[in-house]
Amino acid sequence: MFIAVEVSPVMEDITRQSKKTSVENETGDDQSATSVVLKAKRKRRSQPRDAPPQRSSVHRGVTRHRWTGRYEAHLWDKNSWNETQTKKGRQVYLGAYDEEDAAARAYDLAALKYWGRDTILNFPLCNYEEDIKEMESQSKEEYIGSLRRKSSGFSRGVSKYRGVAKHHHNGRWEARIGRVFGNKYLYLGTYATQEEAAIAYDIAAIEYRGLNAVTNFDISRYLKLPVPENPIDTANNLLESPHSDLSPFIKPNHESDLSQSQSSSEDNDDRKTKLLKSSPLVAEEVIGPSTPPEIAPPRRSFPEDIQTYFGCQNSGKLTAEEDDVIFGDLDSFLTPDFYSELNDC
């Protein structure tokens, strides 16, 4: 027997509220549990990482490279300025070193060369007495170049000359110059001795970077010799002068050169011929054989990169004034046949 029980509206409302409360309580418990989990995750922290090496140094003129970790030495030359610069002065790179003290010492030596004994140094002046005597006979460019050649990152330590490295396979010395016409480097050929490769680098540096290029040997050896009436006699006189210390080792090794390809030899000879005609000493010793030159030497066409150089005067990279400065001394040695040969190319 069933008894019908009438449920009033008030009871229905109470039932609904109780169900709603129970649902809210369950939801609240879930949210609180989630919040507890989130808070626990926030408290988890990874192990502290090693701080990156500081780029600054306690020594003047020294910074640490962010990638290689080597210490680089720089000097600010306040006296250097040209119209293309927005501020006076330029940064002079002195090389990268494995040891911080070595970079600081390189800065001290460069500062002594630029500004003398009264400049501020990293180490006492008494440590550099012998170096001061050595640097007196060199120009700023020569001495800065010698400092860079002693750095840890220069030419992989295989040669004391700039732009020279030893070939891994044949043992000969190869010369390269970097950042030419947008290329990473320009290959200049291989040579029997370091000095020959260094001269090839100097020639290319003067050709592509002008008279301010940093060279291995004094730039006056290539461009600033007076125009002689008799180049052979003048060369013989220069061999006996104290400034001709390059003569014993710039003679080419003809037997070893026979192993090189004909195109590579012509490239090297023509590049040397182009800029060394103004120097009787170097022209005779590097290009010509030990016997007197023939009256009518064989003609050779200029390689492609030098042809491009003669044709790029209007390209904006080289002005007419720069071209005159570099090649102005060569006009007295060039015959009309020389220009006609260039036009035929």
Curated annotation (Swiss-Prot):
Family membership: Belongs to the AP2/ERF transcription factor family. AP2 subfamily.
Keywords, comma-separated and alphabetical: Activator, DNA-binding, Ethylene signaling pathway, Nucleus, Repeat, Transcription, Transcription regulation
Region (Disordered): 15-62, 243-302
Designated name of the protein: AP2-like ethylene-responsive transcription factor At1g16060
Major subcellular location class: nucleus
Source organism: Arabidopsis thaliana (Mouse-ear cress)
DNA-binding is among the record's keywords: yes
Source organism, top-level taxon: Eukaryota
Recorded GO MF terms: DNA binding; DNA-binding transcription factor activity; DNA-binding transcription factor activity, RNA polymerase II-specific
Disulfide-linked positions: none
Subcellular location(s) per record: Nucleus
InterPro entries: AP2/ERF_dom (IPR001471), AP2/ERF_dom_sf (IPR036955), DNA-bd_dom_sf (IPR016177)
GO process terms (BP): ethylene-activated signaling pathway; negative regulation of seed germination; positive regulation of cutin biosynthetic process; positive regulation of fatty acid biosynthetic process; regulation of growth; response to abscisic acid; response to salt stress; response to water deprivation
Cellular compartments per GO CC: nucleus
TM stretches of this protein: none
Task of the protein: Probably acts as a transcriptional activator. Binds to the GCC-box pathogenesis-related promoter element. May be involved in the regulation of gene expression by stress factors and by components of stress signal transduction pathways.
Pfam families on file: AP2
Record's keyword annotation contains Transcription: yes
Residue ranges: DNA binding: 58-124, 160-218
PROSITE patterns assigned to the protein according to its UniProt record, in alphabetical order: AP2_ERF
UniProt xrefs under PANTHER family: AP2-LIKE ETHYLENE-RESPONSIVE TRANSCRIPTION FACTOR, AP2-TYPE TRANSCRIPTION FACTOR
